[in-house]
Regions:
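Short amphipathic alpha-helical interaction segments
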Residues: 57-68
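Conserved adenosyl
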Residues: 112-249, 254-256, 272
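A short glycine-rich, Lys/Arg-flanked "PGG" loop and its adjoining helix->strand segment in the class I
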Residues: 255-267
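Core SAM-dependent methyltransferase catalytic element
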Residues: 329-350
């Protein structure tokens, strides 16, 4: 077959860009851990000698790091002054840990997937799964930080108000269960905003529950939040409102989880399901966000589900498949409540 040289060069250009992005992901994590972005944000324009002095690293490393970041557009370079700086937009994404657009946690989580390449290759080859607890430890912290920024930006201001009557009930005081709570960021955000309500978070990963419990104490919400180790199919209690954040598609038994949530809800209860944004048609997911989620799905989400003998819904399951799971649990009402570029928020009722 004849190769179209123009198309070949276009593809090679894309691949080179991806190679640069791959290695730069490591340097984003390095930059956060060593306070390099923070130094630029606090001090203004710096050259490599000044950055090295402020952060205690070798100047040669500072020089290479600065130019990698400038080449990728993550920082800016003033050639006349020979200094590097963080524009305000990049400050919000790389130096402000409380910003809803803060990114280094995302890089930490996705970089952890590369550290598990041998496990992923084995899972592919041997048609087996990878349990959540068998991944590199950076995944747990990175995923929580990745999700937390989205929850801070949207959960209270957008997602909960999109549900039928839930916000008012939360302010009055109800019982809430957060299934698959991980490190508890979603649970704690809700507990801070709705102090009259009581919250319980369940997760089958003991280390995550230990972390969540400590973070609830640190946040001063332990009086209304508790965390327990439990599988999504057999947790205890009766609730007015249930939530599952970015976890249903990972589960080994999502249908069983839906049945247990249905069983645990009161007759007038409601279930909010937060899932990665996805269309039912794979072709419509062939974009930068879909690419990111399919990558996470192939390395983490589907292997996690398969490890539990699950259906492997994946991070791009789409509304129809999620709806089928929800309805299999006994729910009669299911709708898209709202959406963002990164998430779809569903509401289900008995």
């Amino acid at each position: 077959m004849t190769i179209d040289d123009t198309k070949l060069q276009e593809f090679l250009g894309k691949a080179v860009s991806d190679l640069g992005a791959t290695v730069s992901s490591t340097l984003v994590v390095v930059g956060e851990k060593l306070g390099l972005y923070q130094a630029l944000a606090e001090s203004g324009p710096l050259n490599s000698h000044e950055l090295a002095e402020k952060t205690g690293i070798l100047e040669r490393y500072a020089f290479e790091w600065l130019n990698n970041q400038a080449a990728g557009g993550y920082i800016a370079y003033d050639s006349k002054a020979n200094k590097y700086y963080l524009p305000e937009e990049q400050k919000a994404c790389l130096a402000d840990k409380d910003s809803p657009t803060y990114l280094p946690g995302s890089f930490q989580s996705f970089l952890s997937m590369a550290k598990d390449e041998e496990k992923v290759t084995k899972a592919f080859k041997e048609k087996q799964g990878i349990h959540w607890g068998d991944h590199h430890c950076d995944l747990y912290e990175g995923v929580e930080r990745f999700f937390r920024t989205k929850y801070l930006a949207n959960l209270i201001s957008n997602w909960i108000p999109s549900l039928d009557g839930i916000e008012e009930k939360l302010r009055d005081g109800i019982h809430v269960v957060d299934v698959g709570c991980g490190h508890g960021s979603s649970t704690i955000i809700m507990a801070k905003e709705y102090p009259n309500s009581k919250f319980v978070g369940f997760d089958y990963h003991p280390e995550s529950i230990k972390t969540a419990t400590q973070r609830a104490q640190d946040a001063g919400v332990s009086d209304r939040v508790s965390f327990e180790v439990s599988d999504s199919t057999n947790f205890s209690g009766s609730y007015d409102f249930a939530t599952v954040f970015d976890a249903l598609h990972d589960m080994g038994n999502p249908h069983g989880a839906a049945k247990q949530i249905y069983k645990s809800l009161k007759k007038d209860g409601s279930w909010m399901i937060v899932e990665p944004f996805s269309s039912d048609k794979p072709r419509e997911n062939h974009n930068p966000i879909g690419r990111m989620f399919y990558g996470a799905s192939a390395t983490v989400c589907v292997p996690c589900s398969i490890a539990g003998n699950g259906p492997g819904l994946g991070a791009q399951a789409g509304p129809t498949r999620i709806g089928d799971v929800v309805k299999s649990g006994g729910f009669t009402k299911f709708r898209v409540a709202t959406q963002t570029p990164m998430n779809i928020i569903y509401e289900a009722n008995p």
